[in-house]
């Protein structure tokens, strides 16, 4: 929000300097980004009147003038501006003047004609960059008066960076309220009178989309003359607020926007066909905007329409076909309240950003529409003439925002701020803020005005009290708190321990957004409905994640584009699964997820160069499961997952309960997800890896272990894990290790079969095993494999 300091001081004028005012606003939460003079330094520039003007005898593009500057004799000046003519009031730099850029005005001759000064343009005085001829001043500008004094150029433009919740301060009125509160001053509202209708013309208004637009006011104004210039006092206030003067109608609506904070729009009445309807866009409906851009409107876009066509994108941008031009004689003026949800994100969707959408997205005062209408009408009639009809209003009270009172507890206020503020002071602060206040000795009941739509809970009021009381007035004090030793169960693993275990294997911890791109998430989880945010940060972050994979995939894709060859990330966090049976309709599950892509390890002379594969990631997961002290309880079972490669994916089970997934991302997603190398992922429920049994000390056997190798031929599609699980379930207590060390398919093995070689390590804790006992145990294993898998010993 950029504005003129002098304009603000017309509303409230504290006895403090510009610097002190800026500091005061910043400390109250309205951060001042910049304070700049509205004009560069120059002097000896006065108001003049061209009393003679004729062509230069020796130059086609020059004119010879005599200018009255309030002295005994007029000044001879040669001018090259096309708009120089007899009778206009101008800005004259007299001999001796110094203009911006240290440009000094001296007596001179141009093509033989004396020139004792210069008729100035806005650019030459450093006011605006555009060079559109010399400055033309109003006819009542006093000849001879210093130009800086006449335009009050000893002023500053203040630029405030407002947080999104303070939409009420996107106006002079709103900032003046704040300054008045901070300085205990009343705000002087400029005098404005309600305009009495002088004609009976009206347009009826219907609200087909009442929820999106619960209040709409319109007024017909006829016989306006839009060729009249906008008064210099208004154009200067607009310029100092960063807005260029265009024409009287646009200037007035912009002025009201800055003064009151309420956007308005004007239509050419003669271009309208029938009455006004505020509705949602029809399928495939198109609108040519004021910038001549043709857009196809989405069906959730709110539009202002007549009986035949859409006229404007409500709260965002006007349409060209109904726009006001210099030749317009009759206009229809709009003042409406659009719900923030109806406008939010619409401008960005169509590649637009306007002052109107900026305010409507943050919220405007739902009670301000008539005030804005009367103010704009008054200004338009004063500048352009014409006659105004009565104000027509359509309102759906049920959809207008309702403000509930807020309770502020004295004990809560003191606890949060850490300082005790006298109850009378708190009451005074709340009343100065314009709130309705009652206090019963323990708590305040506070009624919130319609323009403070950012206040809804007790903490909001605590913040208001703190910033008006003054953060600097709150004395620093060391925090006082009781420190207690916390009990940490040895049977409970922390997420830090799990992440550290993965970091030790070369992973880096990542933190990604819980909001993800719905298109990318739908690719991987097309059968899982996701929660859609009503007010997303952006369209690309509008869905809650149903897995941590989308965020991790985005991190890998980002790094692959930056030539990173070894990528491994681990993350813990929540995934959000829609579930009507869960609290608030969403099931939040804590998980630990990982992703690997690129090379298996960094380049090193002692290591071969190979890409990461499924078994690298499976080994990482097994190391993670080993942290539980019960890795044997988990097993990997080949399964299908729509996000994963059908031949390189598995579900992770603990007993009969599925607790996670692992596999290679399906190659068909690589291009859409921005991946250029094979990528492997895993995800586990955090609850199953944070629990572990307490360690039990067992004596180490003093007797030797015995190894036997067992090679069996089984079906080619049989997973080795199933064989190992079957052997472990035989119940041989002497079995201490079982390991697959060879897989063979080829000569000597029948078609459709594979040879699996396992090492079996046996050891008894009480004695040395004899050969007969070992043979008996191995026979049990072989018989089990034969009966369950039709396995045969390999020759």
UniProtKB/Swiss-Prot annotation:
<dbReference type="Pfam" id="PF17759">
    <property type="entry name" value="tRNA_synthFbeta"/>
</dbReference>
<dbReference type="InterPro" id="IPR004532">
    <property type="entry name" value="Phe-tRNA-ligase_IIc_bsu_bact"/>
</dbReference>
<keyword id="KW-0547">Nucleotide-binding</keyword>
<dbReference type="Pfam" id="PF03483">
    <property type="entry name" value="B3_4"/>
</dbReference>
<keyword id="KW-0963">Cytoplasm</keyword>
<dbReference type="InterPro" id="IPR002547">
    <property type="entry name" value="tRNA-bd_dom"/>
</dbReference>
<keyword id="KW-0820">tRNA-binding</keyword>
<dbReference type="GO" id="GO:0000287">
    <property type="term" value="F:magnesium ion binding"/>
</dbReference>
<dbReference type="InterPro" id="IPR045060">
    <property type="entry name" value="Phe-tRNA-ligase_IIc_bsu"/>
</dbReference>
<keyword id="KW-0460">Magnesium</keyword>
<dbReference type="InterPro" id="IPR033714">
    <property type="entry name" value="tRNA_bind_bactPheRS"/>
</dbReference>
<keyword id="KW-0648">Protein biosynthesis</keyword>
<dbReference type="InterPro" id="IPR005147">
    <property type="entry name" value="tRNA_synthase_B5-dom"/>
</dbReference>
<dbReference type="GO" id="GO:0009328">
    <property type="term" value="C:phenylalanine-tRNA ligase complex"/>
</dbReference>
<dbReference type="GO" id="GO:0005524">
    <property type="term" value="F:ATP binding"/>
</dbReference>
<comment type="similarity">
    <text>Belongs to the phenylalanyl-tRNA synthetase beta subunit family. Type 1 subfamily.</text>
</comment>
<dbReference type="Pfam" id="PF01588">
    <property type="entry name" value="tRNA_bind"/>
</dbReference>
<dbReference type="Pfam" id="PF03147">
    <property type="entry name" value="FDX-ACB"/>
</dbReference>
<keyword id="KW-0479">Metal-binding</keyword>
<feature type="domain" description="tRNA-binding">
    <location>
        <begin position="39"/>
        <end position="148"/>
    </location>
</feature>
<dbReference type="InterPro" id="IPR020825">
    <property type="entry name" value="Phe-tRNA_synthase-like_B3/B4"/>
</dbReference>
<dbReference type="InterPro" id="IPR005146">
    <property type="entry name" value="B3/B4_tRNA-bd"/>
</dbReference>
<protein>
    <recommendedName>
        <fullName>Phenylalanine--tRNA ligase beta subunit</fullName>
        <ecNumber>6.1.1.20</ecNumber>
    </recommendedName>
</protein>
<dbReference type="GO" id="GO:0004826">
    <property type="term" value="F:phenylalanine-tRNA ligase activity"/>
</dbReference>
<feature type="binding site">
    <location>
        <position position="460"/>
    </location>
    <ligand>
        <name>Mg(2+)</name>
    </ligand>
</feature>
<keyword id="KW-0436">Ligase</keyword>
<keyword id="KW-0694">RNA-binding</keyword>
<keyword id="KW-0030">Aminoacyl-tRNA synthetase</keyword>
<dbReference type="GO" id="GO:0000049">
    <property type="term" value="F:tRNA binding"/>
</dbReference>
<feature type="domain" description="FDX-ACB">
    <location>
        <begin position="701"/>
        <end position="794"/>
    </location>
</feature>
<dbReference type="InterPro" id="IPR045864">
    <property type="entry name" value="aa-tRNA-synth_II/BPL/LPL"/>
</dbReference>
<comment type="subunit">
    <text>Tetramer of two alpha and two beta subunits.</text>
</comment>
<feature type="binding site">
    <location>
        <position position="463"/>
    </location>
    <ligand>
        <name>Mg(2+)</name>
    </ligand>
</feature>
<feature type="domain" description="B5">
    <location>
        <begin position="401"/>
        <end position="476"/>
    </location>
</feature>
<dbReference type="GO" id="GO:0006432">
    <property type="term" value="P:phenylalanyl-tRNA aminoacylation"/>
</dbReference>
<feature type="binding site">
    <location>
        <position position="464"/>
    </location>
    <ligand>
        <name>Mg(2+)</name>
    </ligand>
</feature>
<feature type="binding site">
    <location>
        <position position="454"/>
    </location>
    <ligand>
        <name>Mg(2+)</name>
    </ligand>
</feature>
<dbReference type="InterPro" id="IPR036690">
    <property type="entry name" value="Fdx_antiC-bd_sf"/>
</dbReference>
<keyword id="KW-0067">ATP-binding</keyword>
<dbReference type="InterPro" id="IPR009061">
    <property type="entry name" value="DNA-bd_dom_put_sf"/>
</dbReference>
<dbReference type="InterPro" id="IPR005121">
    <property type="entry name" value="Fdx_antiC-bd"/>
</dbReference>
<dbReference type="InterPro" id="IPR041616">
    <property type="entry name" value="PheRS_beta_core"/>
</dbReference>
């Amino acid at each position: 929000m950029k504005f003129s300091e002098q304009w603000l001081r017309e509303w409230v004028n504290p006895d403090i300097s510009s610097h002190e005012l800026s500091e005061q606003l910043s400390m109250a939460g309205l951060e001042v980004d910049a304070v700049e003079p509205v004009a560069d330094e120059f002097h000896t520039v006065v108001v003049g009147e061209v009393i003679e003007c004729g062509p230069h005898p020796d130059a086609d593009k020059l004119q010879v003038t005599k200018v009255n500057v309030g002295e005994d004799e007029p000044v001879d000046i040669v001018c090259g501006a096309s708009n120089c003519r007899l009778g206009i009031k101008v800005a004259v730099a007299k001999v001796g003047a110094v203009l911006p850029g240290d440009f000094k005005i001296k007596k001179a001759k141009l093509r033989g004609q004396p020139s004792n000064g210069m008729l100035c343009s806005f650019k030459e005085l450093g006011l605006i960059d555009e060079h559109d001829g010399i400055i033309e001043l109003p006819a009542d500008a006093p000849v001879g008066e210093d130009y800086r004094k006449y335009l009050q150029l000893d002023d500053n433009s203040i630029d405030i960076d407002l947080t999104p919740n303070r939409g009420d301060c996107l106006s002079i009125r709103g900032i003046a309220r704040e300054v008045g509160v901070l300085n205990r001053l009343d705000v002087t509202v400029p005098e404005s009178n309600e305009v009495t209708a002088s004609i009976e013309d009206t347009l009826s208004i219907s609200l087909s989309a009442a929820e999106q637009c619960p209040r709409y006011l319109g007024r017909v104004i006829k016989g306006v003359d839009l060729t009249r210039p906008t008064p210099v006092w208004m154009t200067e206030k607009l310029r100092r607020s960063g807005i260029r003067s265009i024409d009287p109608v646009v200037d007035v609506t912009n002025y009201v926007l800055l003064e009151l904070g309420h956007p308005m729009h004007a239509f050419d009445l003669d271009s309208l066909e029938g009455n006004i309807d505020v509705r949602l866009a029809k399928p495939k409906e198109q609108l040519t905007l004021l910038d001549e851009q043709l857009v196809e409107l989405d069906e959730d876009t709110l539009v202002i329409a007549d009986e035949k066509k859409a006229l404007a994108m409500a709260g965002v941008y006007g349409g060209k076909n109904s726009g006001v031009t210099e030749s317009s004689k009759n206009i229809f003026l709009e003042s409406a309240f659009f719900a923030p949800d109806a406008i939010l994100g619409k401008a960005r969707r169509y590649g637009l950003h306007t002052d109107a959408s900026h305010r409507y997205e943050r919220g405007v005062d739902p009670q301000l529409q008539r005030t804005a209408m009367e103010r704009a009408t008054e200004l338009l009639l004063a500048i352009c003439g014409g006659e105004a009809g009565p104000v027509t209003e359509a309102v759906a009270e049920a959809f207008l925002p309702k403000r509930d009172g807020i309770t502020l507890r004295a004990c809560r206020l003191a606890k949060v701020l850490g300082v005790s503020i006298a109850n009378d002071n708190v009451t005074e602060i709340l009343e100065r803020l314009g709130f309705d206040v009652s206090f019963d000795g323990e708590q305040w009941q506070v009624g919130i005005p319609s323009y403070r739509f950012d206040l809804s809970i007790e903490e909001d009021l605590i913040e208001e009290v703190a910033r008006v009381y003054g953060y600097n007035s709150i004395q620093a004090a060391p925090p006082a708190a009781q420190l207690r030793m916390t009990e940490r169960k040895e049977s409970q693993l922390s997420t830090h321990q799990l992440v550290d275990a993965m970091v030790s294997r070369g992973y880096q911890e990542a933190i990604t957004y819980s909001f993800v791109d719905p298109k990318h998430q739908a690719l991987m989880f097309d059968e899982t409905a996701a929660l859609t945010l009503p007010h997303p940060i952006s369209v690309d972050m509008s869905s809650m994640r149903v897995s941590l994979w989308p965020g991790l995939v985005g991190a890998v894709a980002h790094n692959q584009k930056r030539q990173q060859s070894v990528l491994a990330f681990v993350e813990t966090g929540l995934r959000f699964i829609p579930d009507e049976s869960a609290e608030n309709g969403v099931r939040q599950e804590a998980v630990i997820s990982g992703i690997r892509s690129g090379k298996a390890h960094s380049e090193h002379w002692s290591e071969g160069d190979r890409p990461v594969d499924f078994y690298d990631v499976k080994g990482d997961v097994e190391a993670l499961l080993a942290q539980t002290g019960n890795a044997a309880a988990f097993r990997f079972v080949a399964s299908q997952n729509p996000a994963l490669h059908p031949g390189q994916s598995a579900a992770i089970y603990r007993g009969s309960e599925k607790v996670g997934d692992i596999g290679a991302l399906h190659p068909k997603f690589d291009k859409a997800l921005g991946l250029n190398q094979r990528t492997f992922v895993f995800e586990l429920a955090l609850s199953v890896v944070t629990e572990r049994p307490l360690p039990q000390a067992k004596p180490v056997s003093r007797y030797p272990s015995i190894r036997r190798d067992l090679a069996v031929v089984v079906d080619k599609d049989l997973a080795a894990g199933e064989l190992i699980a079957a052997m472990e379930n035989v119940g041989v207590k002497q079995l201490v290790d079982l390991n697959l060390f060879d897989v063979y398919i080829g000569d000597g093995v029948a078609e459709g079969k594979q040879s699996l070689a396992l090492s079996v390590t046996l050891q008894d804790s009480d004695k040395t095993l004899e050969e007969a006992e070992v043979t008996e145990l191995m026979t049990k294993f072989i018989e089990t494999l034969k009966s369950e898998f039709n396995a045969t010993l390999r020759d």
